[in-house]
């Protein structure tokens, strides 16, 4: 149902991603930005507090009627769990403990992962590094939808369904685009997570377990914060590959909206990205950006020129080394 989109293919490009060149140019002009490339130990206490709040919510919802449980799962738990996935994004860049304590960050990522209900942090780290190094590379960057997604989700209604099911596509897309051997850390992540889920079930009951899982599924689907999935790299304007968002939801998402700044300087923690924009304002103020993720979701669904195919894609160069 709804109009069919006009785009029937990805936007193939044969140039390098813009972020490395812009990073070099900005650092040559503003070397003080290097001082922003440092750990953010505040993440340790923020993440711990978020997990404790979610544990408290497990107790508060355990005896609710199902309708109210689902209401609070969407209205509250989803915000907390989506925010936690973006905390895990910060952790994947080694910001809590720094690069010299990489394994501390991996263990902390598994700790942050607990409230999500499904193992996520270790696999995300492996694929997210590819996303930065090989942005848009065919068969490597699993942030790019599959051809099936672009072909099938091609009407207004189907695009809405695609948005609702986004967490499932992000979970299973790597298996089709860029499958990797399972590592021992992924096994450990899974064992820890399943053990925690079983404990939630035995301590709080099935309703708390459903609340936790539904919060992740709903929070990563049709949800205001989920606008960042589409806002970051979907090509609403031809020739522009990455877009920043400067609205209030950055307060809940560790400034993930500062996405041009993040790709230009992936070693700068989220709390310092507004300073990058302030220092090098002439490089960012004139780039296309958003102020509403809700509007991004609406435009994606309703605009007949936008679809899962609206991504810039590059052929792999043949020398990519993946972990």
From Swiss-Prot:
Claim: Electron transport is one of the keywords in the record: no
Entry comment on modification after translation: Myristoylation can target the enzyme to the mitochondria leading to an increase in ceramide levels.
Keywords of the record: Endoplasmic reticulum, Fatty acid biosynthesis, Fatty acid metabolism, Isomerase, Lipid biosynthesis, Lipid metabolism, Lipoprotein, Membrane, Mitochondrion, Myristate, Oxidoreductase, Phosphoprotein, Transmembrane, Transmembrane helix
GO cellular component, one term: endoplasmic reticulum membrane
One of the Pfam families matching this protein, by short name: FA_desaturase
UniProt-listed InterPro entries: DES1/DES2, FA_desaturase_dom, Sphingolipid_d4-desaturase_N
Localization (cell): Mitochondrion membrane; Endoplasmic reticulum membrane
Transmembrane segments: 41-61, 68-88, 104-124, 152-172, 184-204, 210-230
GO terms (BP aspect): ceramide biosynthetic process; fatty acid biosynthetic process; myelin maintenance; positive regulation of apoptotic process
CDD domains hit by this protein: Delta4-sphingolipid-FADS-like
Motif window: Histidine box-3: 259-263
Membrane topology classification: Multi-pass membrane protein
Post-translational modification Phosphoserine, affected residues: 307
EC number, as in UniProt: 1.14.19.17, 5.2.1.-
SMART domains for the chain: Lipid_DES
Lipidation (N-myristoyl glycine): 2
Catalyzed chemical reaction(s): an N-acylsphinganine + 2 Fe(II)-[cytochrome b5] + O2 + 2 H(+) = an N-acylsphing-4-enine + 2 Fe(III)-[cytochrome b5] + 2 H2O; all-trans-retinol = 11-cis-retinol; all-trans-retinol = 9-cis-retinol; all-trans-retinol = 13-cis-retinol
Main localization category: mitochondrion
Histidine box-2 (motif): residue ranges: 128-132
Cited PANTHER family: SPHINGOLIPID DELTA 4 DESATURASE/C-4 HYDROXYLASE PROTEIN DES2, SPHINGOLIPID DELTA(4)-DESATURASE DES1
UniProt record similarity statement: Belongs to the fatty acid desaturase type 1 family. DEGS subfamily.
Subunit structure: Interacts with RLBP1; the interaction increases synthesis of chromophore-precursors by DEGS1.
Biological role stated in the UniProt entry: Has sphingolipid-delta-4-desaturase activity. Converts D-erythro-sphinganine to D-erythro-sphingosine (E-sphing-4-enine). Catalyzes the equilibrium isomerization of retinols.
Record protein name field: Sphingolipid delta(4)-desaturase DES1
Species annotation: Rattus norvegicus (Rat)
Lineage, uppermost ranks: Eukaryota, Metazoa, Chordata, Craniata, Vertebrata
